[in-house]
Regions:
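Conserved class I S-adenosyl-L-methionine
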Residues: 156-189
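Conserved alpha-helix/loop element of class I SAM-dependent methyltransferases that forms part
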Residues: 25-60
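Short alpha-helix
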Residues: 201-224
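A short glycine-rich, Lys/Arg-flanked "PGG" loop and its adjoining helix->strand segment in the class I
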Residues: 141-156
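Core SAM-dependent methyltransferase catalytic element
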Residues: 217-219, 233-249
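A short acidic, Gly/Pro-enriched loop at the edge of an enzyme's catalytic core
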Residues: 115-128
Length: 249
């Protein structure tokens, strides 16, 4: 079984057994609020994405990349976007299907591994919404290249990205214990740490990989915001461990 398959199975289990925060679909009431223009979405754990980062949704073709769960895509649909969601977790996609059926709207649901070429034609989308998820893949730069390929000229890429700080520290977030890069495929200690926490396979990525990767793909970065991880000692000390970015093709 590939590490990607293990991660998908892990996320399915988190949703079934652990009431995972990012696997909870929005309620009917939240959907109605979005229809009435009262909405917010997240790319990273705490901060909401500024509305001005999106522009007008009406008639825009939007891809939620590794964005299953029924949290953001229903909102974008309510605001007038034509949405596609790609994820590798069956449970995350089932949440999307459930909300779409409940609220009676159409969404294109695609099960695919984002480490492979994305199953879309060139210049298919106006917006790609890519919340924190590339911590579950080893190489991020090919994903940014694929995003550039499938976005229309002038299209917007919105990303939630974790920093290396998340992977430096021990479980209590009190000591720096791991050297970088954090890669359980190459480091037994990293693998054992993740197995102890039932965290699947996760990987650190540098700013050169994540910001530089977008620039190398051809994007122009227009906005960056810091964020914390929402809980734990690093959060309590207001240490930023995530960033959200807006880039344009």
């Amino acid at each position: 079984m590939s590490y990607q398959d293990i991660n998908a199975a892990t996320i399915n289990r988190w949703i079934k057994e652990e009431d995972w925060e990012w696997g909870k679909a929005i309620s009917h009431e939240e959907y109605i609020k979005a229809l009435n223009g009262d909405w917010n979405v997240k790319l990273t754990p705490v901060k909401f994405v500024p509305h001005e980062w999106f522009g007008d949704f009406k008639g825009k073709k939007l891809l939620g990349l590794a964005s299953g769960g029924g949290q953001q895509i229903p909102v974008f649909t309510a605001l007038g976007a034509e949405c596609t969601v790609l994820d590798y977790s069956d449970m995350q996609l089932e949440n999307e299907r459930m909300v779409a059926e409940r609220e009676n709207y159409k969404v294109n649901i695609v099960k695919a591994d984002m480490t492979k070429p994305l199953p879309f034609e060139d210049e298919s989308f106006d917006i790609i919404f890519h919340p924190v998820s590339n911590c579950y893949i080893e190489n991020v730069e090919p994903v940014f290249k694929e995003c550039y390929r499938i976005l229309k000229k002038g299209g917007i890429l919105l990303c939630g990205l974790g920093t290396e700080i998340n992977y430096l520290v021990d479980e209590s977030e009190e000591k720096i214990v791991f050297s970088m890069p954090f890669n359980p495929l190459k480091n037994k200690e990293h693998k054992e740490f993740l197995e102890k926490l039932d965290s699947g396979y996760q990987f650190s990525h540098t700013l050169s990989e994540q910001l530089g990767g977008q620039l190398k793909a051809g994007f122009t970065l227009t906005n960056i915001e810091d964020d914390t991880n929402g809980a734990g000692r690093l959060h309590e000390m207001n240490i930023s461990t995530y960033i959200m970015t807006r880039a344009v093709k």
